[in-house]
Amino acid sequence: MRKLLLCAAALLACGVGPAQAADLRDAWLAARQQHPGMAAAAAERAAGDARRLQAERIWNPTVAAQASAGAMGSRTSAQGAAFSLPGSAPVAGVGFETSVHSGPGTRWGIEARMPLYSPERSAQERQLRLSADLSELQAASLQQQLMLQTAERYFAAVLAEQQHALLVRQQQATDRALQEARDRFTAGDTPITDVREAEAQALATAAQAEAASVDLQIARRALAQTTGWDPAAPQTLRPPAAVSALAETMGAASALGPVTSWLDGAAHENLQLRTQAQLVAVAAQEAAKAAQGASTKVDLVGQAGAEHLSGSGRWGSASNAARQFMVGVQIQVPLYTGGQQDARAQELLRLQDKAQANLDSARLEVAQQVHATWLQLQAGVARAHALEAALKAAQARLDATQLGRQVGDRTTLELLRATNDALQAESQLLAHRARMAQARLQLLALAGRLDESALQAATDAGTPVSPSLPPSS
């Protein structure tokens, strides 16, 4: 007993026990940590946060400054001027001229501006907030796509493992049948044609096993690219869940529930539809930015500036200096844009119509996908029951054939056929469970309900399935 416990502990320490087998949720958690798709989703969310911050600050005041220096020249002339001196009468018809041919000059200015009213800016604010929400939806869509891709590659690896193991065992069985045929031919019990048929079957099975080995390597590498697992040390994967787990997976007491509930859920929660609806809202705000009167602006403005120029002019040394400031309200109303603004507004309205048409088309497509997937799952339940019954019948036939082989009523070839039939039935059931699991996840994704709990429920919590052959007698 002590030796048995030590062996069991050693197996568990090496990760061989069934408790160490990875399920679909484990694969997703690994993919979430390292797949570039999640980095893209995180970047999309960060971009959305930046757009939301832009919307919050779009009405904040702005301050701009400018300065310049260089060689400058200036000439001013005034005619018909008048001036007066203290204690003397005004003198009219006077002319003044100043000039600086070339000299050092400086100029600076500063302006502070705060928008008070702008339909275009208001539409831009709403558009930025909608774009921020759109980024969140797009990031969620990227995450959901990675979930479905992980599930697809996970189940592909499970089926490749199953098919490869099946063909390896079939190859072992055909090798035994070939050896038996050769022995019986040597003893004179069978003709040479039986040996040739056994050789042909052995070669065909070996070729199929080699092809299955290649498919298995491809499936493992594809899963490794998604999860970051080492393809040279593949994980033990849990098989897809049985059909009996359907009700728990779907969160309904009566299996799938009516298709109308899934259609309603998809109409409100489907990420593709929500994203497309958000694009329609963004297009509407883009059109509002170009609407008539949207370019009218009212700003609170404060300005200050100065200019200085010195040098020699026509009448000797000279210098000019000027300072100005202004605080007030500035109103800008476009009166005529040459028709370009109207054409731009028409273009954006048509683009809004296009976005709405794309949304209507997406609704039809999603509804069709929901209906088709729901029907597939409905039919799949009966198909699963039939395959389970076929597996039980094949196992019973295998047991009977094995017993008959022991008492001499059945031949080795009959035992091999019964064994292959049982393994094929097991493989078909596992493949159907994988298709059903993927269809369930797809339906949940269409309804916007795909999450980690659904991924975990998609795989069997029991011991990983491994096809096996009875010992040769």
Short names for language-model regions:
Residues 1-20:
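Gram-negative bacterial Sec-dependent N-terminal signal peptides
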Residues 2-3, 22, 143-265, 373-376, ...:
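Periplasmic alpha-helical coiled-coil/stalk elements that build and connect Gram-negative outer-membrane
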Residues 29-39, 46-61, 97-105, 109-127, ...:
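A glycine-/polar-enriched beta->alpha junction
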Residues 38-55, 142, 146-165, 176, ...:
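Amphipathic alpha-helical coiled-coil segments
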Residues 41, 63-67, 276, 298-302:
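Membrane-embedded beta-strand positions of outer-membrane beta-barrel proteins
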Residues 66-110, 241-254, 288, 301-340, ...:
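Small/polar, glycine/serine/threonine/aspartate-rich low-complexity segments that form flexible
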